[in-house]
Amino acid sequence: MAVLTDDQVDAALPELGGWERADGVLRRSVKFPAFLDGIEAVRRVAERAEAKDHHPDIDIRWRTVTFVLVTHSEGGITEKDLQMAREIDEILDR
C-alpha cells in the first residue's frame, strides 16, 4: 500500500474527528470523564484493530488516551491508517 502525500492526508482530515497529522503520523487525543471510560474505549479499539490486523500506538495518561496511526511497514501514513482512524472515530463517537 502506497504512502499518502501530505496533501492527500490533509484532504482527508476534515472528515476525521479531532485527528491531526504531525511528525509523519496521524494522532488523536481524547479526554474521558473517568479513567475506566478510557480503558473501555481502548479495549474496544483494540478488538477492532486486532480484527483488522492494523494496530495503533496507544498512550494512556489518566483520563486522556492518545491514538497514533502510521503504517510502519510502509514508512508513512497510508489508506489503512485513514480507515482505522474512521473506525476509531466510530467507536469513540458512540
Curated annotation (Swiss-Prot):
The keyword Protein transport does not apply. One of its GO terms (molecular function) is 4-alpha-hydroxytetrahydrobiopterin dehydratase activity. GO terms for biological process: tetrahydrobiopterin biosynthetic process. InterPro entries: PCD_sf, Pterin_deHydtase. Keywords: Lyase. Pfam families: Pterin_4a. Gene3D superfamilies: Transcriptional coactivator/pterin dehydratase. Its EC number is 4.2.1.96. It catalyses: (4aS,6R)-4a-hydroxy-L-erythro-5,6,7,8-tetrahydrobiopterin = (6R)-L-erythro-6,7-dihydrobiopterin + H2O. Belongs to the pterin-4-alpha-carbinolamine dehydratase family. This is Putative pterin-4-alpha-carbinolamine dehydratase. It comes from Mycobacterium sp. (strain JLS).
